Amino acid sequence: MRRLAPLLLLLAAAVPVLPDYAPVRPEAPVVLPRDHGAHPAFRTEWWYVTGWLALPDGGRRGFQVTFFRTRPPVDQRNPSAFAAKQVIFAHAALSDPARGRLRHDQRIARAGFGLADAATRDTALALDDWSLRRRRDGRFVTHVAGDGFALDLVLTPTQAAILQGRSGYSQKGPDPREASHYFSLPHLAVSGTLGEGRQRTPVTGTAWLDREWSSTLLNRRAVGWDWLGLNMDDGGALTLFRVRDGQGQPVWAGGSWRDKAGRLTILKPGDVIFSPGRPWRSPRTGTAWPVSPTVTVTLPGRRLVLGVVPLFPDQELDSRRGGGPLYWEGAVSVPGGRGYLELTGYGAPLKM
């Protein structure tokens, strides 16, 4: 974090211009492997890995490794090497039920100078000594070393990617321009090493990778979203999201269900209901987080009702000191599956 304050001052001092961000277009499908790489013409983008780890002694951990790329509203024609044309930041977190709180850390730097990079040819992200890249054999490898923890993991795809929405065009609001290009890789097989303090432990597990990029993501009424990604025990995969207004009412909703046979159902706004349940209140921020919702999903010929149970309640991640949001990102389980729940906009409206 040693360069964080100077970088934020630089961004604040940058002369804004009317940005010519690339639009999300429904007629532009996601194409793989091309779209594993960065899309610098768009305003924002992320590579989001979440998963569960199993330790040899039977212990469990949840983990998050996320890289973000953002294009600030500065003149991209500026010839200065110091112009913050692209900024890379990253979050990493470890959920330990024995500890009852997250370990987490973050990094941020402008692209260039050998400090940070997001390659366009394929997934190849670097930020200081943190990294996430896709190898020629299709496996992903990541290294992050945070405050009291480290992750060195190999993520092996076992299923085809899910192109969310319509061939990867995922609408996020009533205006079709409120959308992202979005695909997911569920059921990644995890192997590697977990570091906790001075101890190094071999781990295995299952993870989920979300890839998303956009220039206009949220409706002006939206304050945040709820997102749920579940790897089901039978090989199915469930993605759900809800964009909320200030009264907690849905602005938009959607997701996908791919069953164990590989049949994909794209979910419409009326197919997805998040019922909050009893909230957990953070002792640090005072924010009430609905960490145990019940989700109701309407599928062809049946209705799926799942109660979400967090690995433990306190999985709040406060990245505001790095210019990021306050959010809850935690390992959760449902009958017949495990995954991650993300909650944003409960402490303050999310700015995107």
Could you say what each language-model-derived stretch is?
Residues 2-3, 211:
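Basic side chains
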Residues 3-4, 9-23:
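Bacterial Sec-dependent signal peptides at the C-terminal "C-region" and cleavage site
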Residues 16-352:
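Structured soluble/peripheral alpha/beta segments that form catalytic or ligand/cofactor-binding pockets
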